[in-house]
């Protein structure tokens, strides 16, 4: 047998755990028809299963909360307000653990840590402005900071992020 499937509820969320003999190390989760499906290695202990199911539910809920923010509209409004270039793509990322945001100027793409969805809006706006400024000035030189400093809460937001352990995104 390749996979064993079990169902449970975690809080309000219905979860389906799929134990796969083909899966060796990784844990993956995705939503199917309102059910969070969590795939784990078949040899994983019940304690490890509980840990990873809880972790995947937390990640999914964090992603869901970030979906409530209309990111494209917010980025477009900030780009207009502060006269900064518009990106071709902007998305939330669950994989950004050491950065609040990142920008690839050559692709005109911006990624924002989904953790920002839980921070005050003015902090999110600062990180967006910071990343938008990279579309015009990739390096952290004086021209870059002149663009970022158009946002009136730059110093306050930088202080907030420093207190959280990370100063800026890149």
Per-region residue spans from a language model:
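Walker B catalytic acidic pair
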Residues: 131
């Amino acid at each position: 047998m390749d996979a064993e499937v079990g169902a449970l509820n975690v809080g309000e969320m219905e979860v389906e755990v799929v134990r796969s003999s083909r899966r060796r190390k990784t844990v993956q989760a995705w939503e199917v028809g309102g059910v969070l499906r969590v795939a784990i290695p078949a040899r994983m202990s019940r304690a490890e299963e509980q840990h990873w199911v809880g972790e995947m539910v937390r990640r999914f809920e964090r992603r869901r909360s970030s979906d409530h923010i209309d990111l494209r509209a917010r980025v477009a409004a900030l780009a207009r307000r502060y006269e900064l270039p518009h990106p071709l793509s902007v998305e939330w990322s669950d994989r950004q653990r050491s950065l609040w945001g990142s920008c690839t100027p050559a692709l005109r793409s911006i990624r924002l840590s989904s953790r920002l969805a839980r921070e005050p809006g003015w902090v999110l706006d600062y990180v967006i402005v910071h990343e938008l400024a990279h579309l015009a000035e990739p390096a952290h030189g004086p021209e870059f900071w002149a663009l970022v400093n158009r946002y009136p809460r730059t110093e306050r937001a930088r202080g907030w992020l420093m207190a959280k352990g990370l100063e800026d995104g890149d």
